[in-house]
Amino acid sequence: MVKKFDFLVIGSGIAGMSYALKVADKGKVALVCKTTLEDANTFFAQGGIASVTNELVDNFDKHIEDTMIAGDWISDREAVEKVVREAPSQIQALIDWGVDFDRNENGEFDLHREGGHSEFRILHHADNTGAEIQESLIKAVRKHPNITIFDHHFAIEILTQHHLGVEVTRQTPDIECYGAYVLDIETNEVHTFLSKVTLMATGGCGAVYKTTTNPLVATGDGIAMVYRAKGTVKDMEFIQFHPTALYNPGDRPSFLITEAMRGYGGILRTKDGKEFMQKYDPRLSLAPRDIVARAIDNEMKHRGDDHVYLDVTHKDPEETKRHFPNIYEKCLSLGIDITKDYIPVAPAAHYLCGGIKVDLNAASSIHRLYAVGECSCTGLHGGNRLASNSLIEAVVYADAAAKHSLAHFEEYSYKDEIPEWNDEGTKMNEEMVLISQDAKEVQQIMSTYVGIVRTNLRLKRAWNRLDLLYEETEELFKQSVVSRELCELRNIINVGYLIMRQAMERKESRGLHYNIDHPKSEA
């Protein structure tokens, strides 16, 4: 079946929904979501959203400098300036949509400070800021008459000239996006969504790794689709591992112990109770995430331990419960009282700094296709993301994409000659074990060889293993009736390959990419 919309939005986190709300007054919007609107990475963001609001002590230049330092000086300066300077107006847009940020008794924002920030500038809603934003946007989206929500729909491929029989290569200068083939997971039908403009907002790819704080839907779908359509993908080697995910084997996703807990005064300790951050960085537990994650990884490998501890037992118990109610309840459910007991933590794949390369308008290298949020690479994060810069990047670039696409979408027409999905000659896959086992294998390969610390030999081994899985999976895809599980396996193999290949191409240790065989560049 063919469905036509002015705007096709693939993904329903803060990026996809804020874009949808900004364009919906001017045209019909399809919001495609592979599970439900609640199941986005945004929902899991605890810490907050960074913006200069207290101008008595803070200013844009400080936020810009902090971002450049965190990014190891390879962030795109224009992107950094754009996000920092436009942040306050986008915070207001969120408030207008119903987001309730915590305030102090004077009615001013109650600001947190997190690792890498020189000032208190993190707006938050207790310790579940992402959930507050997601729920507010869901309400606004559901109310809008021009937005049609397609939940349990999974985008398989974006449509380009390739689907009209034209040969498209990475050198083709004018690739255009005409929409997407989308699988209705409940009926197993593939629909052709034709659009004037498409926005990719599919989030990150934490599910490529064995341990991740991301929801299980974070399989890098948008990045894989755009790469297969010959779009440009950049900086995939920069994977941020959150240093402190709650250590609870079998939890997937891993429960996040927010950065704000270290900003609050939490101390990292080894299993025998000794502090260790003084060996690694003068900022101790408040050092940037990559330094803390490598320090914890090193302590664990050196000692043969499977976790370290985060200690807030020296803080006022009532204050701890007030600041971190969710963390307190979660730990208590596991028999850990954080006001008296140390919290067991270990690093987990958390955030992708790279993705679909976009310009200042959030436009990708494929015409009529924009990308916003974690699936995009704006250049803001460079080699490493500054804490709480991602939610604000998503709304700033969603705004840019909305303005640019609204200025141009009426110039475009639907490509009615795109053929419908053809699955002749395919059969139902009777062997789901092939897919589930291969997915586990990808996660094991990535965690072992392309994790926090890398070497040339590990990366080469990952290449060889992924190459074999790629060949087998492509063969299975051609023969089988399409399914969400098979598409996700294909996507994590594509994304794993991109992370590994771009890691091999970077002949230095920089930001989050740490290769023992290539010492840190002094440049």
Please identify what each model-predicted range represents.
Residues 1-6, 22, 36-38, 44-45, ...:
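Glycine- and aromatic-enriched mobile tails/lids
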Residues 7-31:
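N-terminal Rossmann-like FAD-binding beta1-loop-alpha1 element of flavoenzymes
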Residues 35-68, 72, 240, 251-255:
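Conserved N-terminal glycine-rich FAD pyrophosphate-binding loop of Rossmann-like flavoproteins
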Residues 37, 225, 231-338, 343, ...:
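An anion/pyrophosphate-binding glycine-rich loop and adjacent beta-alpha core
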Residues 70-110:
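Rossmann-like flavin
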Residues 75-88, 121-139, 150, 212-220, ...:
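Short beta-strand to alpha-helix junction loop
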Residues 96-189, 194, 201, 245-248:
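Conserved redox-cofactor binding core of oxidoreductases
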Residues 157-169, 173-174, 178-187, 336-380:
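FAD-site-proximal beta/loop scaffold in flavoenzymes
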